[in-house]
Amino acid sequence: MPEQKRWSKLTRWTAAGMLSFSILLGNVFPVHAETTAPAAPQISEWSVKTLNEGEKYGIYPINWYYDGSFQKSITPDKFKTLMEGTETKLDKLGFNKKVASLSFPTDKVITRETVITSLHKLLANYELPKAFDMTADMAPIDYMQNKGLVKGTKAGLELDKPSTVEHAAVMASRLVEFAYDAAGAGAEGLMWKVTNKQNTLYLLGSVHLGLTDMYPMQKSIREAFDASDNLWVELDMLNGDMSYFNEKMQYSDGTTIKDHVSKETYEKLQKALTKLDLQGNAFDGFKPFAISTSLSTLGYAQNPEAYQMAMLTGIDNYFITKAMLTGKPIHELEGIKLQADLFANVPPAQQEKELNTMLDSILNEKGMEESAEYLKKMQLDWIEGDAEGLAKLLEVGFEDEASKRLIGERDKNMALKLAKLLEKEGENTSFVVVGAAHYVTKGMVVDLLKEKGYTVQYLQ
C-alpha cells in the first residue's frame, strides 16, 4: 500500500469518529504495561466548570489533581510551574512584551493576593490592545474583579489567606480565557449554522484526539453551545452502556486472537506490541477490529501521558463533559450499538486484512512519526478553521471498503436525523458534534442538508 494512502487511512479513522472506540477501549482494559487506575481527582464543585476549560490549556499538569495536594497550599515550585505555563499560553497571542523576563514571589507561603497580583503583573507585561481596558490608575485586584476574574467583594476575598493549588489554577484559567476572548483569539474550529424556520443547528466538526492549542476555542463556538437547548453526538462515550460493546469486541468462546488469525499476523502483532511497549497478551481476548481501532490511536502519542492528554483534549469529550456540568441534555445520533455493529459485522478475513494494514503502519520505521504528523496537520486545520485544507488531507484513498463504512451510509442517516430536528415545531436550537470528515467531505452531511433546501452557513 502506498505510504500516503496508508497514513491517510489512519487520519480518516480519527476524523470519521471511530476513535471513540479506542477511547472506550482505554477504559475497559490496561493497554500499557505500567498503567494503573488513578485515584479520584480532588476537585471542588465550585471550580470544576472552570477547570474543565483550564486543564485543556496545558498551563498545569493534570497529575496535580491526583497527587494529594490540589486542595492544599500551593508550593513555590508549583506556583512557578503555573506562572510559566500561563505565560507560555499568553505568549501565543503574539503581543510584544514590555520586559523580557519577570520575577514572581518565591515566599514559602503564597497568598491569594500574591496569586492575583502576580497574574495581573503577567498580563500587564504585554502591550495590550484597547479591548483589555488596562490602565495604570486601576489597582490589580480592582482590575481582576472588574473583569470577572476574581469573584466576590474585596472584604470577602481573604487575600492574606494561603492560596491552594486549586484556587491558583482557577485564577490562571480564568485569566487565559479572558485574554484570548479580549484579543478575539482562540481556535477557529469547523462550524456550520443550519436554519429552517425557527430551528437552528450548530454543526461542529470534531477531532477526537486533541491538543492544548485547540483551547480555548473561539468565544463564538462556546456561545453557540451555551445558546443551544441540547447536545447531539455520535455516541455518548461517558454515559453510554458499555455492555453491548464489550460483548461485540471480545471472543466469548474461550478462544483468543491467536486462534483466529494467521501465524504471520499474530507474530506481527507481537512485534507491534513490543514496539509500543505493551504487554504481549494485552489484546488476547479481543477481535481484530477492536485491536485495530485501539492501536490506531496509540501510534499518535509518544507516551501514556501524551495519549491521556490527547484524549482529554478531544472535542467530543470536551463538549460531553461540558454538557454534563451544565445540565444540558445529551442525545446520540448513532450510539454504541450502531458503531459496535459497524465493525463487528465485518467478515473476519477483512478484519484481519485491516489489522495487518495497521500493524504494517506501526512497524514501518517512520510509521508512527508520520501518523502523528498527519494527526497534527488535521488538528492545525481545525485550529485555523481550514475546512478545505482538512478535506484535501482526507480525500486520498476514500475508495476502499473500510472508508465506505466510515463515510457514506452513516452520513445519509445522520442527515435524516438532523432534518427531523430542523422540521420540529416551535423554536429549537441544537449543538451537533460529529467527526469532522462527515462535514467537510463532499456529498456528505453538510451537502445533504443543502440539497434538502436548508440554509447552511460556514461560520468563521
Predicted regions and their residues:
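N-terminal propeptides
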Residues: 2-5, 21-186
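Sec-exported extracytoplasmic/periplasmic mature domains
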Residues: 56-60, 84-91, 95, 120-128, ...
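N- or domain-start disorder-to-order transition segments that initiate the globular core
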Residues: 182-200
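Structured, acidic catalytic/metal-binding patches in enzyme active sites
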Residues: 196-402
